[in-house]
């Protein structure tokens, strides 16, 4: 930009002087060439400086990653002990950084087959609870056990295979419908895959595709709606039949009809399993055995929907505000 302005200024001033007879056109041409020759290295230098600044910023991120504490060595315990889904949090403390503790002295016991709903404002500490359960993060203090076994004594991979997840952003990979459903159980038969899809209300949808269950899905899952993607992930969880489920905002971005299908599929999925449901839409978790109201990393209220509404506290205000907004 600076070089272009210099070129224009030289051309205008030189042209005026040439018309007045002060200099010749050859002199003007020579000055224009000089301006180009001077501007080019200045422009290149600015590009180099910009590239260096980007490289320095990238290097800072790389070295910050290298300076991170290494993941603790994997344990050699037996995760097959996880059969009931009895979960206990004892004096759990956690923070993303040492300077800021997010969860303070959390104590919680979840019995087998119970549905636990976790609600609260955005950024209040709902998702970290299940992330800690699956050991995506390590505790700063306290312990978490499943069926009496401390999760730090179990291999991470084996632990996570025994916890089914249905997330808000349904994740499918490149492969067929059947391969996506069987992701957690590669040895599953076609009959088992179809049975899981039927229970998850996505059998009809799968059969109407051009190649049925053998229809390939691309990375962008063209032609598959968000609701159907979530139904496929529910079918995947049904096929693995885990003792514990984590359901994170699974109906927050679908239409009403699809939401009804997802709710039916989830009801079947949660039968006989310990379930942790993270939701902002409080109407979907009124039947939960236990509702945890989390704010700033602490459980400020706990109880059933009826108990919490009777207390007329933070949960009741959240619940009423949603229906007033609707």
Show which residues each predicted segment covers:
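Conserved E/DxxT/N motif and adjacent residues on the DHp alpha2 helix
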Residues: 64, 71, 182
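A hydrophobic transmembrane-helix motif
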Residues: 1-29, 52
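An intracellular "coupling" helix at the cytosolic face of ABC transporter transmembrane type-1 domains
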Residues: 1-5, 51-54, 71, 93-98
């Amino acid at each position: 930009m600076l070089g272009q302005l210099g070129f224009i200024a030289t051309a205008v001033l030189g042209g005026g002087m040439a018309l007045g007879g002060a200099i010749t056109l050859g002199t003007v041409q020579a000055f224009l060439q000089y301006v180009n020759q001077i501007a080019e290295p200045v422009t290149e230098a600015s590009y180099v400086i910009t590239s260096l600044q980007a490289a320095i910023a990238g290097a800072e991120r790389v070295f910050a990653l290298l300076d991170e504490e290494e993941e603790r060595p994997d344990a050699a315990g037996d995760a097959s002990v996880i059969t009931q889904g009895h979960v206990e949090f004892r004096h759990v403390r956690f923070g993303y950084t040492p300077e800021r503790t997010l969860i303070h002295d959390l104590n919680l016991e979840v019995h087998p087959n119970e549905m636990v709903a976790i609600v609260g404002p955005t950024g209040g500490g709902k998702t970290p609870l299940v992330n800690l359960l699956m050991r995506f993060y390590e505790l700063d203090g306290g312990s978490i056990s499943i069926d009496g076994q401390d999760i730090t004594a179990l291999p991470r991979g084996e632990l996570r295979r025994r916890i089914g997840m249905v997330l808000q952003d349904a994740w499918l990979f490149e492969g067929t419908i059947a391969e996506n459903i069987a992701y957690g159980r590669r040895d599953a038969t076609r009959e088992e895959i179809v049975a899981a899809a039927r229970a998850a209300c996505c059998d009809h949808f799968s059969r109407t595709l051009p190649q049925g269950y053998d229809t390939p899905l691309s990375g962008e899952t063209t032609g598959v709606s968000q609701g159907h993607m979530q139904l496929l992930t529910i079918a995947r969880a049904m096929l693995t039949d885990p003792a514990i489920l984590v359901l994170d905002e699974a109906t927050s971005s679908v239409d009403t009809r699809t939401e009804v299908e997802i709710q039916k599929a989830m009801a079947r999925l949660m039968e006989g399993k310990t379930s942790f449901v993270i939701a902002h839409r409080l109407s979907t978790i009124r039947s939960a055995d236990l509702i945890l109201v989390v704010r700033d990393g602490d459980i400020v209220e706990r109880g059933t929907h009826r108990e919490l509404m009777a207390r007329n506290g933070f949960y009741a205000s959240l619940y009423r505000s949603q229906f007033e907004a609707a």
